[in-house]
Curated annotation (Swiss-Prot):
InterPro entries: Satellite_CP-like, Satellite_virus_coat, Satellite_virus_coat_sf, Viral_coat. It comes from the Viruses. Keywords: Capsid protein, Virion. The keyword Cytoplasm does not apply. One of its GO terms (cellular component) is viral capsid. It holds the Pfam family TNV_CP. GO terms for molecular function: structural molecule activity. Coiled coil: none annotated. SUPFAM superfamilies: Satellite viruses. It comes from Satellite tobacco necrosis virus 2. This is Coat protein.
Amino acid sequence: MTKRQSKQSNRKSVASQVRSIVESMAEQKRFAFLTNTNTVTTAGTVINLSNNIVQGDDLVNRTGDQIKTIHQTLLTRCTGITNSQSFRFIWFRDNTNRGTTPAVTEVLDSASITSQYNPTTFQQKRFTVFQDFMLDTSIVGRVIVHRTAVDKKRRAIFYNGAASVAASNGPGATFVLVIGSHATGQYDVTAEIVYLDM
């Protein structure tokens, strides 16, 4: 190893140690978000998950404009009503958000349950998809179906404001897109985020 490589290695080691110390001193918090009895649409809906962690002094609030996730869980539940139908859930992170909620057609190429991802935004690496799954319900047998998805990777989420509004979204904001094959069924979404308050 050359002297230059040794210095770079030492710098990385020191930076890693400092990061570890800062994270060990940060307060670990837990936030749960529930939206229930929503009617699915064939055009799709994007639900903001992370901007519900508002700035404040409470146990579930953040003190600044950044958190680091330790563990995220998404629970989904669908109920078929009138028709047997499919529900598609896309749980994702917006890597470059600047105070908006992404449109369905920014994530998908078209507002359709069978659509591929939007090639432009994904080529730009705007979104990171955690999970993309379909749940099928039947009004005869499987009236209610559910699924749990987990992300255990540590990820930074930044905020542009204190309140629970789209304008507060920053890079790393997390969302779930829900779209159905029929506009009759209902769904529930619960998100739990365990995070370090940075």
